[in-house]
Amino acid sequence: MIQKLRLFLILPLFFYSCGVTESEYKPDIAIEIEHNLPVIDGVPTLTLNQNMWQNIHYIDFKVTVDGRPAQYSSFSFNSNLFWFIGDTNSYGKKNCLECSMYTIGDHSENIHDPVPTSNYRSLTDSDGETRNAIAPVSIMKGETYKLWWDVWVTGSMEGREGTIDIKLN
């Protein structure tokens, strides 16, 4: 009788312990973006200097995992605008990340490939921070600059992606 009672008390504990699983850890990944631009009508706006061909501007990124800086997080960047070496009358544009580029303006045939207006890659430092240089040219005034970013967070085996729209004034 005592053995049956022990079995009766132990079996529920055994089944309960087999059924309880710990929840899977999901890191809290945060990406902070500082575009360092004035916001006009709800849109970050970069005023292009018409006395300069190329206008360089920096956008800052910070990656944290569970509130701590994420070192060596790998960023990829793409933009929707391109320019051509030796051609000041036209530029290239893409409507989406995977779309083909088309030309705007009086494009003279040249042998040069389109020049991107953004760096392609960057890594975060020990503070989880990095910068990306964007460099639209003066004839792009009036366009909306799209910066597509994608980050792979080292150690967390997870990534994040997003888009920043910037009005070129």
Set out the residue ranges of the language-model regions:
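Beta-strand-rich structural segments
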Residues: 32-37, 42-75, 79-84, 132-133
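Bacterial Sec-dependent N-terminal signal peptides
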Residues: 12-39
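Short beta-strand elements
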Residues: 158-169
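Short flexible loop/turn segments that cap and initiate beta-strands
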Residues: 63-117, 162
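Glycine-centered loop-to-beta-strand initiation motif
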Residues: 124-132
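Short, exposed beta-strand-loop hairpins at the edges of beta-sheets
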Residues: 148-160
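Sec-dependent signal peptide recognition
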Residues: 3-10
